[in-house]
């Protein structure tokens, strides 16, 4: 596929608001692609050139882009920065600059989808002291051959700011329509393989190929998620439920095969080297050829420590042994996804739990099975007294659904009004905070868009503000007076006293007395709260006030 065709399709899709029309156009394109182009297309149309499990990262920030665009267009770097700041959208700004470039590129070639993917793979593999310069050279090379429209979408992909109105749901249905297969099977295959590119290739082969997908060690899948709820609400399902401690730690997946062990974070990043002590414990406790799901907690003096302690270990690259000696890390296992060449996610939870207790010699989380609300509440208070967050209620007949926040797992913890919001902008501070950001613009997810809902200026320590200022420098994509706007990457946990209707924000709601609690480095943008979540909370709160 010629990349210009891809760019023209993206431009067309951006202008379409109807879901069915989007799916129809995608399906027509997908059905016409070659086997080689099909996986590339399905990854790039989502703005994600690599599967989450691959570990590949582009690591291209605005500063690298400024340098490459300045070279290709024959402009000064400051002119490029000014244009991007004024236009607001980096892709649109690069399109403008390429259409006005003052020098002619020689030896340009017609770019294909495969060319762009090859360049992205090349960029992702660059490490070391010269990697930044090498990345700039690759970006210069592809932009030199790009038309203005191609440059628009190359930029959006490089900055991971690709929003054309196509999400996984639309792509799933388009793949199903293109190859006349059941969309539920496409969804199932993507849960297992976590790669729409691979799933599209399987769908072309037919429904049996989709049904036959299997988990593979060292190919992590998204972790099953829980929704908030109540004990009484879960018990209405009628059957006894499994009750487990909800730990204040960091989620992980542990894979072991042929005596090789790897550990992955909630975001599917490998953390094996950062957690050698935990890996050693699990290696000793578990047999070969296995994938388990769990949560690791930091313990000091017999009591659990805040989960930030674990996250600091996940990020650590140096002095790991000293950190491991300083604080004890304890893994807690609560599910098993694969064992002895058998995928287990389709088994009922009670059966998975039985297998886990049989094969793991240690570290399986305690469990109560009950349909008695009083007994479950007592267990909940036992968890709180032990320093844990609360309890998890799990339906015993439920399958493991990777990446899904459904009704089968419910978390019960003390009432706290918090939201996980995406940081999309900031305003310079005043007084003693004049050299850092003083407040932050926060947004919720609304389909593939981010909609502002609040600003937050309280709850930060001076050290946190300095860290955030340093961390967010390379994410700035636009400046407007005292405001700066970021390529969305960080998620804040925000406390608040009330959700109010407000005309001041696009979503129609605002937070009263918002306060910063912490950076949720364990969560990516897909796990931030949605506009629908906010509306539901508003309705629930005001319904209870009126009864």
From Swiss-Prot:
Residues bound to ATP: 244, 251, 266, 295, 334, 405, 411
Reaction equations catalysed: ATP + (deoxyribonucleotide)n-3'-hydroxyl + 5'-phospho-(deoxyribonucleotide)m = (deoxyribonucleotide)n+m + AMP + diphosphate
InterPro entries in the cross-refs: ATP-dep_DNA_ligase, DNA_ligae_ATP-dep_bac/arc, DNA_ligase_ATP-dep, DNA_ligase_ATP-dep_C, DNA_ligase_ATP-dep_cent, DNA_ligase_ATP-dep_CS, DNA_ligase_ATP-dep_N, DNA_ligase_N_sf
Enzyme class, UniProt record, top EC level: ligase
EC identifiers of the protein: 6.5.1.1
Cofactor(s) listed: Mg(2+)
Top-level lineage group: Archaea
GO aspect biological process, one term: DNA biosynthetic process
Coiled coil regions, renumbered to chain: none
Pfam families associated with the record: DNA_ligase_A_C (PF04679), DNA_ligase_A_M (PF01068), DNA_ligase_A_N (PF04675)
Active site, UniProt feature: 246 (n6-amp-lysine intermediate)
PANTHER family linked to this entry: DNA LIGASE, DNA LIGASE 1/3 FAMILY MEMBER
UniProt family annotation: Belongs to the ATP-dependent DNA ligase family.
Protein's name in the database: DNA ligase
Species this protein is from: Methanospirillum hungatei JF-1 (strain ATCC 27890 / DSM 864 / NBRC 100397 / JF-1)
Phylogenetic placement of the source organism: Archaea, Methanobacteriati, Methanobacteriota, Stenosarchaea group, Methanomicrobia
């Amino acid at each position: 596929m010629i990349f210009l065709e891809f760019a023209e399709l993206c431009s067309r899709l951006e202008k379409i608001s109807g879901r069915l029309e989007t799916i129809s156009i995608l399906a027509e394109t997908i059905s016409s692609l070659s086997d080689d182009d099909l996986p590339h297309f399905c990854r790039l149309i989502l703005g994600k050139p690599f599967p989450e499990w691959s570990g590949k990262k582009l690591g291209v920030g605005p500063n690298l882009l400024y340098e490459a665009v300045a070279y290709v267009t024959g402009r000064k770097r400051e002119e490029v920065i000014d244009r991007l700041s004024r236009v607001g959208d980096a892709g649109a700004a690069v399109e403008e600059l390429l259409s006005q470039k003052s020098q002619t590129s020689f030896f340009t070639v017609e770019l294909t989808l495969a060319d762009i993917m090859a360049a992205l793979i090349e960029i992702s593999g660059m490490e070391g002291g010269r990697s930044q310069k090498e990345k700039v050279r690759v970006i210069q090379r592809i932009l030199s051959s790009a038309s203005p429209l191609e440059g628009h979408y190359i930029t959006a992909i490089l900055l991971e700011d690709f929003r054309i109105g196509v999400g996984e749901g639309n792509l799933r249905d388009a793949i199903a329509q293109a190859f006349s297969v059941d969309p539920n099977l496409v969804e199932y295959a993507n849960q297992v393989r976590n790669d729409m590119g691979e799933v599209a290739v399987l769908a072309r082969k037919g429904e049996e190929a989709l049904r036959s997908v299997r988990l593979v060690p060292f190919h992590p899948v998204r972790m099953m998620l829980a929704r908030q709820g109540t004990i009484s609400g879960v018990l209405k399902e009628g059957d006894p439920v499994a009750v487990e401690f909800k730990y204040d730690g960091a989620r992980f997946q542990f894979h072991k095969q042929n005596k090789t062990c790897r550990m992955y974070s909630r975001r599917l990043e490998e953390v094996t080297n950062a957690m050698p002590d935990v890996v050693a414990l699990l290696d000793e406790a578990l047999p070969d050829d296995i994938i388990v799901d769990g949560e690791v907690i930091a313990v000091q003096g017999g009591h659990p420590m805040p989960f930030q302690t674990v996250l600091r270990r996940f990020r650590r690259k140096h002095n790991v042994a000293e950190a491991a000696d300083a604080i004890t890390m304890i893994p807690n296992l609560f599910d098993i996804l694969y064992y002895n060449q058998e995928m287990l996610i389709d088994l009922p939870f009670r059966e998975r739990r039985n297998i886990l207790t049989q094969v793991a010699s240690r570290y399986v989380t305690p469990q109560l099975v009950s349909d008695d609300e009083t007994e479950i509440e007592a267990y909940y208070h036992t968890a709180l007294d032990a320093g844990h967050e609360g309890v998890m209620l799990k339906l015993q007949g439920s399958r493991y659904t990777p990446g899904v926040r459904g009704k089968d797992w419910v978390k019960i913890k003390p009432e706290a009004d918090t939201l996980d919001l995406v940081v999309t902008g900031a305003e310079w501070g005043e007084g003693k905070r004049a050299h850092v950001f003083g407040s932050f613009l926060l947004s919720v997810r609304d389909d593939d868009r981010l909609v502002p809902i609040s600003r937050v200026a309280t709850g930060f320590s001076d050290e946190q503000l300095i860290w955030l200022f340093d961390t967010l420098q390379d994410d700035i994509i636009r400046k407007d007076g005292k405001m700066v706007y970021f390529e969305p990457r960080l998620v804040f946990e925000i406390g608040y006293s009330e959700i109010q209707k407000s005309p001041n924000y696009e979503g129609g709601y605002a937070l009263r007395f918002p306060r910063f609690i912490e950076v949720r480095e364990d969560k990516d943008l897909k796990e931030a709260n949605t506009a629908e979540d906010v509306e539901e909370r508003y309705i629930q709160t005001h319904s209870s006030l009126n009864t």
